[in-house]
């Protein structure tokens, strides 16, 4: 059997890992299954249990061999396999004879070495007459030995002895029952702990022992014999204590915590120390401060430590039941533990009596009485001095806590030296030992202290001793020495010290930062300010007072230096970040007033300015004050005295000084678990990195970081890399990597100082480092607050290293940031993105500090050294200043040139905007026709670039004259719907462009992406223009984009052939594009670059970001005039020279050496991830139609939550390697043919090349709505498909580029087609029956007299993300044969709307819309000649008078009147209704508005007590278009609320109902949102439930909260689930409780109403209104209920058609299997008492996602005869609906195809859809005509 199976098991696992890795590298997968099974076996709990059991059996054999014959051996095994003795004699002591009869020699069961005379004599000498015990303990496979030790100095021998401090209950040592507290360990594994073994070596022996641990301990004889009787007295309160009151308290945790804190220990008991005001315990009212906790549940906690009690509380779950006691009868006398060494005899001295004439000190004694739950109230610090031996060494009082026992005593002062505690001389004790002695003291503590007389000042802390300054931090004089950590001697900290490594206290070395504070005159105002704030803040903060006397003329003069920077930044030279009343310096501008002081630095907190306290004020108040406060400025700042980092190879050179390395031992026990959600994790795989250490070291610095898996341990993390150091050159180390070993020395649980010593001790040469890389987790993002003192001066040497100070605050600052925090990756690199940008990683914590931005002002070309770095404040008022600045600075002349007639928007380069965490609710409106376009996406924040090692270069070279060109001026573009695009983000940086829309001329072409996402943004509407491509007009002074690249510039970006594939499915980089810049004589190119071979940052997908990036583009330069390059673009190639792996110098040389023109290949970041096909990843989207005769068409885009974050793949150079492609193609084609072998028809596989207009195909769906098909309904004769000749109308698309379209809806197909690359591989099938299945008849061939078109009601354009309207893109205009006017191509992202008839009176759009209407009516009338026509014609009917189309039937001259007070609301119609409010209000809750993605005013809920509920016609989901003549179609949310509130007694509403939007979740945009919930903080959102019905919705989003910072949620979103738990039918209270209780990462499933229907209905209403104005007929369009027409139709059918039996087919039986969670998916109409008359019940609609559609046996118009055998004859509509709703399992329907019913169903469908005159939502169906025209039976 192995000696140490646990260790060997880990070795085997490591071997398996290596083996699997090697096999994977070789591509061998044959052994994967066996290796996985072996691996899982070793990791299984059962296997571990077997190993533990084997060890227990081995241990049992050893125990049994030592038990005397007169003792029984009762034992058992625990469930985990651990050995447990149950014998009474063993329990009370050892399994042996009484001690008086047993000698040490009889109990030596071990080897000859152990039994040797030498060993025995050493042990007996060390025991000094005490009883000797020999103990053998088996170390378990997991966990420790279960006891802690303490080192105390022996007074007799002067040696450090090791004593057992505590045996942990339930541990291995506790179950063995032999090791006792206060036992002295004499030997470990046969090694005596004599003078040859140091304290550290002894600890190492215990920690490194494996297998069996053999201990020899010494114990006092009396202590051993009386142990059984005294143990309880030592660990618990005396049993004789009588409590005056005991009470059982039960608390139900609601997720906010129990609301009380505990302190105490084993001897004093655990008591309630604090009760949080407003917390759970406070609200309950029964628990009181000072209560002793006796029991928790069924667990007796007397004798436990406070930490153990806290753990018991944590394990209780939500319900905590406690037995507490108070008011003890009589005094509780707790006997302090007997000291292990005799107390030193001190001379009996009176208080403050010593020979004062001879000694510089005075000694006095103090008696302190602890109160229950209170500490002594002193904080100590240890110091080992070398300058004055015997004088300064010792333990000193560092500070006194106000209100504590020491404070009330009044005798103890700061800087007093403690020499004895309860008579025990502590001089020479280690700091940790003194802490233990004081903790173990009883209720009354006697302290002996020494104080230097006031006339002398040799104390290690020169400080005033007055009572007023007891909390003041001591100043530290320059003195050689090393501090001991300070400790707060509080009872509540009793257990924390036990977890600290004693070694750390003696090895931490720290260097004090140099004293840079100017000397202050005593008694000066500065000193008074400093003293006042020091008293307020306490010793953890350093207060600094600075005076600035800056010469400032006026604000306008300042603003000349920067149009973007706020006034207070320019005045003070620093930027301030604010959070929760705290204002921190985020950065200091180089050369500014603050920088010249050399006093303040980033992360300092600004407390007061010119007597005005800023602490506690809002950011707006603080910034407003800083703007107006006059100079000189008196600043009061504080800095936290905490630094836990050290540099490995380059320690900072400083003056020898004393620094207090504070280790705070105090803790307020928190019942809630710590939230480790933010802590980084590292891969368990250890990677070995080999570095060659040179004379400069290894070239990196480190810091320690709390281990996320064990809060008591720390790990060593790479902090930063030294520029051009060994580590950076190797490229294998990055900041954030965990350092686990150096050569053979493991750094597991090593302290920072130890790790530093190990690294320094490594000799020069090859060094092997063990590295663990960070795990990549998308839902966990750390926040890095980056501040730099880098001035960006390019004249600095390249190897200059700039210190970058920044930190990661793991805890949200509470109070005054008075809790210690750790640091992580403090030198996280960043990028100064020229002109105005420093990006930070996005933060989800509400404690985040504001975004920052560093700007480099554009210097003159001859003055690069004068660059200044400044900051931009994020206050919203600044943007108004920016706008005014823009208005006062017109664009350059070349942009303001006159232009031809075509309206084109030009991009004004260089005008950049910032949006950063606006806190106000005000909205900045775009001035005049200007629009703000965000040119940078939110995802760009994820990239940070280091400028520490980068040099920037401005190319100011002589160049030849530009080459004139006459090409490239024919391409013009247009922004569509500039006024309606909104920014996607509200809490991120957006760099925008000002675009004056009133400029004319063919100057700039900018193409929008396929999808422009929008989201509600309350602060500032910014507009995003991602991936802008530009084409400039030819000019003698402007760079050109040559004609051979003009087409590429006009199109959405695409990869050229052979550029390689991208591995991620999404890329935030746009594809490479070519930009040509023509040089001009004596003018520089106008760009500066940064970057090189240095790895800038590790991306989240593991890639390394590096390369050459554009830092700045000068406006009036050749590069700036092209508008084709912008800050942040990555340069891949320059005039054929690949720069992807080039150094900075090589890139500079390549640009200098490039000819004329300079040809750049660049990549830009796009606003939304570009979908990359998985097989052929060369993506492209065609450009919009460049038709100059059409008006700007408005296409409202509504985006869901942003797609998951992915990162750009590395760019790969073009490759011409085509080997094997033909074989792969043949193999793929064979698989495709096998896949579709069962489909009827002829399969075709072709490849086409897209042109600028796409493939030239028009697509439509299947006539049968239950089937998903994509048919070709039109082919552009000038398009690639027609030129190829192999595709025909009627072909059904199955695949595009190996992405399957078969069985997909139009929405899915549209998304796939949009991302198709230039070369498209199409798989389609040709079937003769396809034409009859198509929802749209084939488009006619191009002619001057278009033939009639069939019904287009089922058409859905592939070009739109949402359901698109039928528009001019389908058909050519009748009077034009230009290629541009032909059928619109696939993937066009523009939707036509509102064609003006004056411009194109016979346009195809109008013809199609009319034909949709008239043809449908005609088709109905063929069956029924007397079928009624629409009640009134619109303008579209008049347009058709040209004779191109079949004229509609005559109009009924007498339309029925509609009473607005009683008429029902017909789905799909704009209805006018009137509601009398009575004495109550309307009772409506609305959501949406023009300023929201919903883009419409929609009723959210109808309250029962309101007038609308009494009226009964309005439903939740109805859209309100008008209120008493006030148009709400384009109103904001607040405007709509105002209009509804100001209504008179009778309210006239125009409403629109689209029931399909609310029928099921198919009409919700469902997406996931991950929010990180911090401890003690909420998610930052409010919820509300409906008063009637189910569903919980977001009612408000708290500014600065997690939801607000995430930015994806808006008011009105429905919460569908929380962490996978369904909330669709949960109550508001249930959801609120769950959201409060969750911790860490919270995943919300959100449903948001699709905005397409609202936008579509608005378009419909606008069309209708426009038609009314232009109608030739005097008849006003009527929206009379469709019911009337249907009733006429039914009557006509009954009177004119033959008997029913002649029209019926044979009944057929349809079987449906329906689960409880399934939707049946059919809607019915008819029934007894129906508004349509007493007609049979029939199927009005079949939903594609229902179970009924899967049978493919039901059709719209089928009459239902019976349900599960129950006939429906005579049943009402409601009864039939209930039957279907309650039918589950096996459902048998008998249906029959009835032509009468089919005609009614068809007419119902036509009238509800056709009355919209070509509604954009082509597959919207009013499925029913009962009351509100439909009820869904599911």
Curated annotation (Swiss-Prot):
Q: Which UniProt keywords apply?
A: Cell junction, Cell membrane, Cytoplasm, Membrane, Phosphoprotein, Repeat, Tight junction
Keyword DNA damage in the entry? The reply is no
The record, for SMART domains, names: L27 (SM00569), PDZ (SM00228)
Q: Which residues form the PDZ domain?
A: 134-221, 248-328, 365-453, 555-641, 688-774, 1074-1166, 1245-1328, 1472-1555, 1568-1650, 1709-1795
User: What residues bear Phosphothreonine in this entry?
Assistant: 1543
- What SUPFAM superfamilies does this protein's entry cite? L27 domain, PDZ domain-like
Top-level taxon = Eukaryota
Q: In what residue span(s) does the L27 domain sit?
A: 1-65
Q: Where is this region: Disordered?
A: 456-488, 1171-1219, 1340-1453, 1657-1676, 1811-1834
Query: What kind of membrane protein is this, topologically?
Result: Peripheral membrane protein
Give the UniProt subcellular location, in the record's own words: Cell junction, Tight junction; Apical cell membrane; Cytoplasm, Perinuclear region
Biased composition annotated in UniProt, kind: Low complexity:
1410-1426
Kindly state a single biological-process term from the GO annotations of this entry: tight junction assembly
**Where in the sequence does UniProt note compositional bias of the Pro residues kind?**
1201-1212
UniProt keyword Cytoplasm, yes or no: yes
Q: Which Pfam families match?
A: L27_2, PDZ
Q: Where is the composition biased (Basic and acidic residues)?
A: 464-478, 1366-1381
Q: According to its record, what are the GO cellular component terms?
A: apical part of cell; apical plasma membrane; bicellular tight junction; perinuclear region of cytoplasm; subapical complex; tight junction
Give residues where Phosphoserine occurs. 455, 459, 482, 524, 647, 1215
Q: Which stretches are transmembrane?
A: none
**Assembly and interaction partners:** Forms a ternary complex with PALS1 and CRB1. Component of a complex whose core is composed of ARHGAP17, AMOT, PALS1, INADL/PATJ and PARD3/PAR3. Forms a heterotrimeric complex composed of MMP5, LIN7B and PATJ; the N-terminal L27 domain of PALS1 interacts with the L27 domain of PATJ and the C-terminal L27 domain of PALS1 interacts with the L27 domain of LIN7B. Component of a complex composed of CRB3, PALS1 and PATJ. As part of the Crumbs complex; interacts with WWP1, the interaction is enhanced by AMOTL2 and facilitates WWP1 localization to the plasma membrane.
The family database entries (PANTHER family) matched by this protein are listed as: INAD-LIKE PROTEIN, MULTIPLE PDZ DOMAIN PROTEIN
What role is this protein assigned? Scaffolding protein that facilitates the localization of proteins to the cell membrane. Required for the correct formation of tight junctions and epithelial apico-basal polarity. Acts (via its L27 domain) as an apical connector and elongation factor for multistranded TJP1/ZO1 condensates that form a tight junction belt, thereby required for the formation of the tight junction-mediated cell barrier. Positively regulates epithelial cell microtubule elongation and cell migration, possibly via facilitating localization of PRKCI/aPKC and PAR3D/PAR3 at the leading edge of migrating cells.
Can you quote the domain comment?
The L27 domain (also called Maguk recruitment domain) is required for interaction with PALS1 and CRB3, and PALS1 localization to tight junctions. The PDZ domain 6 mediates interaction with the C-terminus of TJP3 and is crucial for localization to the tight junctions. The PDZ domain 8 interacts with CLDN1 but is not required for proper localization. The PDZ domain 2 of isoform 3 mediates interactions with KCNJ10, KCNJ15, GRIN2B and NLGN2. The PDZ domain 3 of isoform 3 mediates interactions with KCNJ15, GRIN2A, GRIN2B, GRIN2C, GRIN2D and NRXN2. The PDZ domain 4 of isoform 3 mediates interaction with ASIC3.
Provide the protein name: InaD-like protein
Give the source species: Mus musculus (Mouse)
Q: What is the lineage of its organism?
A: Eukaryota, Metazoa, Chordata, Craniata, Vertebrata
Gene symbol? Answer: Patj
